[in-house]
Curated annotation (Swiss-Prot):
Protein name in UniProt: Small ribosomal subunit protein bS6c alpha
Transit peptide segment: 1-65
Record keywords: Chloroplast, Plastid, Ribonucleoprotein, Ribosomal protein, RNA-binding, rRNA-binding, Transit peptide
Location in the cell: Plastid, Chloroplast
Biased composition (Low complexity): 1-19
Keyword Acyltransferase: no
SUPFAM superfamilies per the UniProt record, alphabetical: Ribosomal protein S6
Length: 211
């Protein structure tokens, strides 16, 4: 029989049985293969000091640049060190003894407001001129403080010797402190009033408070 001989030549096991009988390879989870590529994690491991500085170095450096000129200038010496306790620039009070008033002299202050468009050389020349004028009048312990350009409380019109009128909204403030004779104030005020570089000036005597 043709049908009998054909079936006798086929394998004894059916196709379904042969597929199930093939052993399947045991695959490891992908997470296991991934963890093999990582370094073992140690929960007690702490970042080293070098690692901390490398991550935060640019941030600390930016603070030092932003606060250049203040008590942050130069940054901190180290992360374990406290920031310097020096007060901000402009607020530090230098402890020095106040000069005693010489006999026959009085303590005065003169505030002079200069043209805001003066150059630095012009300002220094004017400052030296009035310092010499004060010393020639018998003044002692002359000190000058440059307050910089400050807006005026109100605009000031001033005519110079050439007949030109200027309207000033701000000026360079100079403060003179000194000891001198009372009669030397009038020549100083006369020189300031006639100076084209001086917008406004005022001199007054310092009175000590009595407690």
């Amino acid at each position: 029989m043709a049908t009998f001989s054909l079936t006798s030549t086929l394998p004894s096991s059916s196709p379904t049985t042969s597929l199930h009988s093939i052993p399947k390879p045991k695959l490891k989870p992908s997470t296991i293969n991934f963890t093999h590529n990582l370094n073992p994690f140690n929960p007690n491991l702490k970042p080293s000091r070098h690692h901390y500085l490398s991550n935060y170095g640019p941030y600390v450096k930016a603070i030092a640049l932003d606060f250049s000129g203040s008590f942050f200038e130069g940054g901190f010496g180290g992360l374990d060190e406290d920031p310097p306790s020096t007060p901000p620039a402009g607020l530090a009070v230098e402890e020095k003894p106040e000069p005693q008033c010489p006999p026959g002299l009085r303590q005065y202050e003169t505030m002079a407001v200069l043209r805001p468009d003066m150059t630095e050389d012009e300002r220094l020349t004017l400052t030296q001129k009035y310092e010499e004028l004060l010393v020639a009048g018998g003044a002692m312990y002359v000190e000058v403080f440059n307050r910089g350009v400050i807006p005026l409380a109100y605009s000031i019109k001033r005519k110079n010797k050439a007949g030109e009128t200027n309207n000033y909204l701000d000026g360079i403030y100079l403060l003179f402190t000194y000891f001198t004779k009372p009669e030397s104030i009038s020549p100083l005020e006369a020189a300031l009033v006639t100076d084209d570089d001086v917008i406004r000036s005022s001199s007054f005597k310092i009175r000590k408070r009595k407690y």
